[in-house]
Amino acid sequence: MSEFSYVHTRGWVEVVVGSMFSGKTEELIRRLRRAEFARLQIQVFKPIIDKRYNEMAVTSHDLTTIDSTPIHDAEEIWNLLKPNTKVVGIDEGQFFGQNLVQIAQDLADRGLRVIIAGLDTDWQGKPFEPMPTLMAVAESVTKQHAVCVVCGAPASRTQRTAGGDGQVLVGTHDAYEARCRQHFKPEVDAPTLDWKLKREMEIS
């Protein structure tokens, strides 16, 4: 089940995961907008390190936006939560600590609908906590897919094409590409190739 109809007396956790460029944030915004149409009070949070498009808004790669509050730690949600809030949205969940798991469950136990979007694996193809644990405890998990830049197949992995070997590197098209299993090469210095030319060479 990808999306629940809201029941006012119950809370739950929804998780939206996938590679970069798979539409995770767009899906998060869509669900939050639907909640607004239903006249439910929403609050949206994002990690303060995510300043790629707009520091004060959750923004998808196609520049769809929704106002948000940047925070350092998920624990800050408790001090910022408004009494009439019914739906909490959290983007880039992988950039928060493991305490996000318990906070999400505590919010749901209070009757709130919690929607969290984030990467389920990092640039090395390894589980990107806390998202895998959130997937395990959530009532609903949606796995989004991008399009592989090499062959056009559904892409479930994020290829880093530039910058350091740390797990966290905030970036967009300048540092990452979506890849399928076959074309995923988790080397930090993997170059961005002319894939159209490469495919033509393979065919000829």
UniProtKB/Swiss-Prot annotation:
Where does the chain bind Zn(2+)? 148, 151, 180, 183
Q: Which domain of life is it from?
A: Bacteria
The biological process GO terms on file are: DNA biosynthetic process; thymidine metabolic process
Q: What class of enzyme is it?
A: transferase
The UniProt entry's sequence similarity note says: Belongs to the thymidine kinase family.
Residues annotated as the enzyme's active site: 92 (proton acceptor)
This chain belongs to the protein called Thymidine kinase
**Entry's Gene Ontology cellular component terms:** cytosol
What keyword terms does UniProt attach to this protein? ATP-binding, Cytoplasm, DNA synthesis, Kinase, Metal-binding, Nucleotide-binding, Transferase, Zinc
Source organism of this protein record: Bdellovibrio bacteriovorus (strain ATCC 15356 / DSM 50701 / NCIMB 9529 / HD100)
Quaternary structure (record): Homotetramer.
Give the EC number(s) under which this enzyme is classified: 2.7.1.21
